[in-house]
A protein has these predicted regions:
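Conserved MFS/SLC helix-loop-helix module at the cytosolic interface between two early adjacent transmembrane helices
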Residues: 66-105
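Cytoplasmic helix-loop-helix junction between adjacent transmembrane helices
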Residues: 110-149
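C-terminal ends and interior cores of transmembrane alpha-helices
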Residues: 89-102, 295-309
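Helix-breaking motifs and short loop linkers at transmembrane-helix boundaries and internal kinks
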Residues: 47, 79, 100-106, 134, ...
C-alpha cells in the first residue's frame, strides 16, 4: 500500500499506524523498568547475588543497544511492518520465558529476548512517522512518542508493584508477554509499509552499504550521537539506578519521598520530549533547543550536587527541571535525519539511539565504579552504604557529561528544519 500524498497523509489510518508503533515503544519502556520493581523476588527465587541480579537487569540493555544499528538497516531495507511485528513477537516470547524460568540462566535468556524484541520500538515508530505523517511535524510527533514511552516506565513501577502484590511476579510478567503477542498481531494486521518505507530494498546491496558508509563518515552523525549519549545517559542513570539513594542520603528524604522524587524527574523528562520537539518545529531551528537543554542540564546538575540539603519543594523543582531539559535531546533525531540521506532514515536514528542507550550502559557501571572508589568502608546488613560525600563526588560525572554536550553543540550544523543532504 502506497503512502498517501502529503496533503492527505494525516488520515485515520496513518494515526492508527503511528499509535501501534508508539504502543511498541511504550512496551519497551514498561519492560525496561519492571525488574527494578521485583528485585527482591528475583533475588529470592533465583538465589541471586547483587552482581547476578545486575547481569539479569543488564541483559535487556545488551541486546537493545547492540541491535539498534542492524535494526535500522533492516527497517530501511524491508520496511517497519514485518520487522516490528516479528520483534514484538520475540519480546512477548522472551517475557513469557522469563516468567516461567526456574533458574537464573534461562531468566537471563528471556530478558535478552525481551531487549532484542523491544529494541525496534522507537526507531521503527520514527520510520513510520517519516513516511506516514507530515515531515514538518516529525520532531513534535517523535517527542510525543518518547513521552508515551516514559508513561510506560511510570506504569511499570508503582502500578506493576500493586499487580505483583496480588498476582505474583511470574504471572505479571507472563501477562506482559501476552500483551507483546497481541501487539505483534495488531502490527501485522494493521500497519502497512509505504513505498518510501522500504525504498532501500530496490537498491543493490552495494548501494545500501555505500549509503551506510556515508552515515558513518558524516561527522554530524557522530556529533549528534555524542550529544544524545551525554544528555540522556545522566538522567536515565540517575532516575533508574542511583537517584533514590542520593535523595535519601544527601537530601534526607524518606524512602517513599525519594522514590517519588525520581518519578518527578521522569515526569519532567517525559514532558521535555514533546515540548522540545514542538519548540524545534515552531522555531524552525534544531540547535536552539539542543543548546538550551545542554546548558540547563549543566546548571541544574551543579546546583543539585552543590546544594547541601535544599527544601523538599526546591529539590523536586530541581529534579523536574533537570528531567525537562534532558528531554530536549529528542531534537537530535530530527537533525540527524536532515543532515543524512533521507532514504536511510531508519539507519540514522538507529545509530543515534544506539549511542544514546550505549551511553547509559557505560555510565551506569562507571558510576558504580566511582562510588566504590569513594566508599568509606561502611556496611549495613551486608550492603555497602555510600556517604553523602561519596555520592556527590561520584555524580560529578553527570555535569561533566552535560559540559561535553554543550561543547558538541559548537560543531552541529543547523538545518533550519529542512533536508540539507540528499
Amino acid at each position: 500500500m502506497a503512502a498517501p500524498a502529503e496533503s492527505t497523509r494525516t488520515t485515520g489510518l496513518a494515526w492508527l499506524i503511528w499509535a501501534l508503533g508508539a504502543a511498541h515503544y511504550f512496551y519497551a519502556f514498561f519492560q525496561r523498568v519492571t525488574p527494578s520493581v521485583i528485585d527482591q523476588e528475583l533475588m529470592r527465587d533465583f538465589a541471586a547475588t547483587g552482581s547476578e541480579l545486575g547481569s539479569l537487569g543488564g541483559a535487556y540493555f545488551f541486546t537493545y543497544a547492540g541491535l539498534q544499528f542492524p535494526l535500522g538497516i533492516l527497517l530501511d531495507r524491508y520496511g517497519p511492518r514485518r520487522i516490528m511485528a516479528i520483534s514484538a513477537l520475540i519480546a512477548g516470547i522472551g517475557s513469557i520465558g522469563f516468567g516461567l524460568a526456574e533458574s537464573l540462566t534461562p531468566a537471563i535468556v528471556g530478558r535478552l529476548l525481551v531487549g532484542a524484541g523491544v529494541g525496534v520500538g522507537l526507531i521503527g515508530t520514527m520510520k513510520l512517522i517519516m513516511v506516514w505523517l507530515p515531515p514538518s511535524r516529525f520532531a513534535t510527533i517523535t517527542g510525543i512518542t518518547m513521552f508515551i514511552g516514559v508513561v510506560g516506565a511510570l506504569l511499570g513501577q508503582t502500578p506493576v508493584r500493586l499487580v505483583v502484590d496480588v498476582l505474583g511476579w511470574r504471572e505479571t510478567v507472563i501477562w506482559a508477554g501476552a500483551f507483546g503477542l497481541l501487539l505483534a498481531a495488531g502490527i501485522w494486521l494493521i500497519v502497512r509499509d509505504s513505498e518510501k518505507s522500504a525504498v532501500a530494498k530496490h537498491e543493490t546491496l552495494t548501494g545500501v552499504w555505500a549509503g551506510l558508509r556515508s552515515i558513518l563518515a558524516n561527522p554530524q552523525t557522530w556529533c549528534l550521537g555524542l550529544y544524545s549519549a551525554m544528555l540522556s545517559a545522566p538522567i536515565l542513570t540517575f532516575t533508574t539506578l542511583w537517584g533514590s539513594t542520593f535523595a535519601r542520603e544527601s537530601y534526607g528524604l524518606s524512602p517513599d519521598m525519594a522514590v517519588f522524587s525520581m518519578s518527578v524527574a521522569l515526569a519532567g523528562f517525559g514532558l521535555g520530549l514533546p515540548s522540545g520537539g514542538w519548540a524545534s518545529d515552531q522555531l524552525g531551528q534544531r540547535k536552539q533547543p539542543l543548546w538550551a537543554g545542554a546548558i540547563l542540564c549543566l546548571i541544574s546538575w551543579l546546583i543539585i550536587l552543590c546544594w547541601p540539603q535544599p527544601p523538599l519543594v526546591a529539590a523536586l523543582v530541581l529534579f523536574f527541571i533537570n528531567g525537562l531539559a534532558s528531554g530536549w535531546v529528542v531534537t537530535v533525531f530530527a537533525l540527524a535525519r536532515e543532515v543524512n540521506l533521507p532514504r536511510f532514515g531508519g539507519s540514522v536514528v538507529g545509530f543515534i539511539n544506539m549511542m544514546g542507550i550505549g551511553g547509559v550502559a557505560i555510565l551506569q557501571p562507571f558510576t558504580g565504579f566511582l562510588l566504590d572508589q569513594f566508599w568509606d568502608g561502611t556496611i549495613e546488613n551486608g550492603i555497602r552504604v555510600y556517604s553523602d560525600l561519596a555520592l556527590r563526588q561520584a555524580f560529578l560525572v553527570f555535569p561533566a557529561c552535560s559540559a561535553v554536550a554543550v561543547a558538541s553543540c559548537f560543531f552541529m550544523r543547523e538545518s533550519h528544519n529542512e533536508q540539507v543532504v540528499g
